[in-house]
Amino acid sequence: MEFSGSPLTLFCCVFFLFLTGSLAQGIGSIVTNDLFNEMLKNRNDGRCPANGFYTYDAFIAAANSFPGFGTSGDDTARRKEIAAFFGQTSHETTGGSLSAEPFTGGYCFVRQNDQSDRYYGRGPIQLTNQNNYEKAGNAIRQDLVNNPDLVATDATISFKTAIWFWMTPQDNKPSSHDVIIGSWTPSAADQSANRAPGCGVITNIINGGIECGVGPNAAVEDRIGYYRRYCGMLNVAPGDNLDCYNQRNFAQG
C-alpha cells in the first residue's frame, strides 16, 4: 500500500490500527452491545428497581480493568467464562418471571431487599460483608468501607466489584475465573468434598453455605438455567458438574 502522508500521520494510522485490533481481541469482541442487550433483555423493565442502571459501557469499562476476564484461554474458554459469569450474576439479581421466556429476568435488582446491615448485598454479585467491601475497594481503589453505596450508584464500580470477586481466590476457595477456564486443580480436600471442576463449584464459591450439599434446590436450578441459556447464545457447551447438590461447602473444609 502506498502512503503519501507525513510520518506523524503514518504513525497515528498505525497506532489506530493496532489499538482497534487489540480491542477486537478483548471481551467486547464476544460480548457485543446487541448480545449484552439480548442476554439481559428485561433488565430495564419498568418493574425492575435496576431499570436503567446496568449499561453495556459500564460492563466493558469494568471488564477492561481486569485483563484476564473473558480473555483467557481459547475461544471456547472465553465464551464459557462469560456465560458462567452472567449466569451466576443473573441469578443473584433476578427479577423472576418478567416474561414468558425463562431465564430472562437477570439484572433486575441492584440492592438486596434486606438492608438491615450497612454492607448488604449490592451489584451484580450482591457483594456483602464489610471485609469484602474493604478488599474490593482496595483492589479497585475506591473507599467502599465508608462509601458502600457506590456499588449501587455507580454502574462501573458495581461491575468492577463483581468481576473482582469473580477473579479473586479467597481462603480455601479458588477463583471462579480459574475454575471456569480450567486452571484449577482440586486438592485432596476438594476431592473428598466432591468438588470437581465445573459451574457447581462456582455456585459453591458464591453461596455454598446455603445452596450446596443440601440436595436439589430451586436456587441452584435457577443458576444452571441462566448458564445454559447463555451458553446457547454463545454457542458453547456448558460442560459437566453443573450443580453442587452433593458437594460439601468450602466452610466445612
UniProtKB/Swiss-Prot annotation:
Localization in the cell: Secreted
Disulfide bonds: C212-C244
CDD domains found in the cross-reference section: chitinase_GH19
MF-aspect GO terms: chitinase activity; endochitinase activity
GO annotation, cellular component aspect: extracellular region
Pfam families (UniProt xref): Glyco_hydro_19 (PF00182)
Known catalytic reactions: Random endo-hydrolysis of N-acetyl-beta-D-glucosaminide (1->4)-beta-linkages in chitin and chitodextrins
GO biological process, one term: chitin catabolic process
Induction: By TMV infection.
Signal peptide, first to last residue: 1-24
Active site: E92
UniProt entry tagged with the keyword Oxidoreductase: no
UniProt keyword terms in alphabetical order: Carbohydrate metabolism, Chitin degradation, Disulfide bond, Glycosidase, Hydrolase, Pathogenesis-related protein, Plant defense, Polysaccharide degradation, Secreted, Signal
Effect of substituting C199Y: In strain: cv. Samsun
Family listed: Belongs to the glycosyl hydrolase 19 family. Chitinase class I subfamily.
Function: Defense against chitin-containing fungal pathogens.
Name recorded for this polypeptide: Acidic endochitinase P
Organism, as annotated: Nicotiana tabacum (Common tobacco)
